[in-house]
Amino acid sequence: MKFVFFHLMPYPYLPDDFDENHPSPSLTFPSKYFDRQAGNRLYHRYLDELEYAETVGFDGIAVNEHHQSAYGLMPSPNIMAAALARRTERAKIMVLGNAIGVRGNPLRVAEEIAMLDHLSNGRVVSGFVRGIGWEYFAHSINPTRSRERFNEAHDLIIKAWTSDEPFQWVSPNYEYRYVNLWPRTVQEPHPPIYIPGAGSSETMKFVAEHGYTYMSVYAPTSVVRRWFDGYRQAADELQVEADPEKIAFSVPIYVADTDEAAHREGRRHVEWLFHRGLKQSFAQVYPPGYMSPGSMRGLLLSGMKPYTETSYEELLEGGYVVVGSPDSVAARLQQLQQQLGFGQLNGLFSIGDISHEETKRSMELFSSKVMPALRPLGTAQNTVAGS
Amino acid sequence: MTEAAIDVGADTNGSPHEEFLEFPGGRVHLLRGGAGKPVLFLHAAGGAGQWHEFHALLAQQFEVIAPDHPGFGGSDELADVEGIDDLVFHYLDLIERLGLERPHVVGASFGGWIAAELAVARPDVIGSLVLLGPAGLRLPDHPVTDLFLLTPEQVVDVLFQDPAKASVLFPAAAPSVDDILAAYRDMTALARFAWFPFVSDPKLERRLHRIAAPTLVACPADDKVIPVAHGKRYAELIPDARYEELGGCGHAMYFERPEAFAQITADFLAARTASAAEPSGASR
């Protein structure tokens, strides 16, 4: 098992009337609620936590991209990765990922990741995501072109990283007369690629075909199981090995000394994340054309409730989050690992409005008491029932 | 032209014929009803594929031809039609395919934008022009409401002056999965053309002087989607255009006050048809 410490960098200081008067922390939540000094302190606190994760034994530290939102304060994940690159030595620096569907200029992403690979001495992991629906509003990118922009940008970036000679790139959404990347990446042929999946069979096949890592987004275990099974099946059909370490399970985790303390403290942080951070309208998340007709039908028929209507108890039972004493968390994650067959755990420890002290304590307990129990699981030699 | 039209409808009691026209990449669905000088009706973002009271009223005096835009209603998404310029060529093809000679063109909201672009590109091809609450201009001081971001309840509130009339456009109290998918498909089709630049062609204003057709611009006085400043600007820049405002009505226009919008449209077109002294129904 590989352990990743993932950060969203939320802005937790919402106004008292947020629940009543603000439909979402994203896109239209006024930036006047961003306190400059408090925000400034947050960035440094969050970067400290990412650095501390390496110290306590995480294999990777991960950042991601969100725009115009209190849900996450990293419009440019590459800047955060740069800040971490020279302050850490061992952990993978994981950008999960650049929202190449939204970015105006994908060549810039290829350039920045290549630079990061040098700053980190070859530790960069490059995730590619489409970007959440509201970000297509935020950056005026046509969501009906999201899928093709993502595919074209991916192909362009990979070719830019692997080509030894200048080339011309012409595709429906991008045109470059000269692509000739300086610097090349340290890693050869290029950094590992991570792609999130949320049920699309095209994505499963795409990830398996390229040997990329498939990572889940926050969903119930039954749903994640379908996704991971789909990915393994796609790999089988392509006759490539579905290495468990290329299946990454994403989950918020809170560990305290006892179950009682963990739930007492953890509940509000989890509720902040799912009931405030992820408070968003259907139109915000699924702008027109962002979903294919088939995916939209699947979503409507799945009966998945909006996050805001899913109670803390349901989040726990559904496997959206894991909270408890070290023993309980280890047991629950072992159980989930048995069911899902992942070899990489992408944990969110700095959940919602959690304090720095609680985060650190949770990380320490996880590292000293949970990691050892899980470490042997989910390796290629130690395959599981789920596969 | 080619005989690609497949008539699958029946003509009883003034109900429309349903036809399909084959195009590269798919087929286009259209409704046709009434008799007289042909009127090409270009629908708004909502209401594709349906024959409303407004259509029936116009069809008492004209032959009304109401195609669904590519990707809307019963029309396939035509991969090659992905921008407003493509839509202009698409409708020039359609006019030619149907053998329409200088048809009147009536467009509402998004369809009004297409109608204006058509009249700019080929002033010689159309008869008279009626723009109902037209979209298409980029007027930063008079922003268009972002329908893409609204909840279903908010959509009703901004579209109708009297929300009680919304059932004309949104009949189902609790929409089925298929209803939601159909609405998502129409909005996706709209977004292809209208996401960016937002429901507008920044170059359209400077080209409106090319329009030669007698033009009526009619706007609902209580439009909360496209401020009436847009209609006024159209009327200002199109040579000799007439501008009218209809009270007690929101942007839903022909869904909220079908008689009023049919009347003002029919009166304007009838006057033009008479003064042009052309034999009616020339093409058929």
What label would you give each PLM region?
Chain A
Residues F29-H44, N98-L107, P189-A198, I253-A256, ...:
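Active-site mouth loops of central-metabolism enzymes
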Residues A62-M80, I100, A219, L348-E358:
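Glycine-rich, proline-tolerant flexible connector loops at the mouths of alpha/beta enzymes
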Residues M1-R87, P191, V384-S387:
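N-terminal beta1-alpha1-beta2 module of alpha/beta enzyme domains
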Residues F3, A53, G57, E65, ...:
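Conserved, mostly hydrophobic/aromatic
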Residues E54-T55, A81-E89, I113, D117-V124, ...:
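Acidic (Asp/Glu)-rich catalytic clusters
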Residues M74-V95, F366-R375:
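Alpha-helix-loop-beta-strand connector modules within alpha/beta enzyme cores
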Residues F5-F34, R147-R184, S222-F342, R375-S387:
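An alpha-helical appendage that flanks or caps ligand/catalytic pockets
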Residues L14-D16, N105-H210, R225-D229, Q233-L238:
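Internal, glycine-rich beta/alpha segment that forms the wall or movable "lid"
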